[in-house]
Swiss-Prot record:
The lineage of its organism: Eukaryota, Viridiplantae, Streptophyta, Embryophyta, Tracheophyta. Binds 1 heme c group covalently per subunit. The modification N6,N6,N6-trimethyllysine is found at K80, K94. The keyword Heme applies. It comes from Sesamum indicum. It comes from the Eukaryota. This is Cytochrome c. It holds the Pfam family Cytochrom_C. It is found in: Mitochondrion intermembrane space.
Length: 111
C-alpha cells in the first residue's frame, strides 16, 4: 500500500514515535550536528546520501532517492529492504498509522 492510501498522520503521535524510536540516532534541529545517523533537518526534497558532513554507506548514496512522503512511507516499512546495505539498523515501522504519524511529524519538524 502506498502513502496515498495511508491514514491521515498525527503530528503529536509522530513526535512520540520519533522520540522513542529515532532520536537516539537522529536529530531534526537546524544546525545541530550529526549523531549516529544524519541530522534530518531539510529532509523533504533532498536526495538520499547527500547531507553535508555525514559519512553515508555507498548503498545510501547510490540509491539516489528523493525523500518525500511516498519514499519515506516505503522506506520506513523496511529500511534494509528498501536500501540494501544501509547503515541504519532500525527494523522499520510495520503499522501504516505509525509511518503516517512519523512522516507528519518529520514534515513539520524538519522544515
Amino acid at each position: 500500500a502506498s502513502f496515498b492510501z495511508a491514514p491521515p498522520g498525527b503530528v503529536k503521535s509522530g513526535e512520540k514515535i520519533f522520540k522513542t524510536k529515532c532520536a537516539q540516532c537522529h536529530t531534526v534541529d537546524k544546525g545541530a550536528g550529526h549523531k549516529q545517523g544524519p541530522n534530518l533537518n531539510g529532509l523533504f526534497g533532498r536526495q538520499s546520501g547527500t547531507t553535508p558532513g555525514y559519512s553515508y554507506s555507498a548503498a545510501n548514496k547510490n540509491m539516489a532517492v528523493i525523500w518525500g512522503e511516498n519514499t519515506l512511507y516505503d522506506y520506513l516499512l523496511n529500511p534494509k529492504k528498501y536500501i540494501p546495505g544501509t547503515k541504519m539498523v532500525f527494523p522499520g515501522l510495520k503499522k501504516p498509522q505509525e509511518r503516517a504519524d512519523l512522516i507528519a511529524y518529520l514534515k513539520e519538524a524538519t522544515a
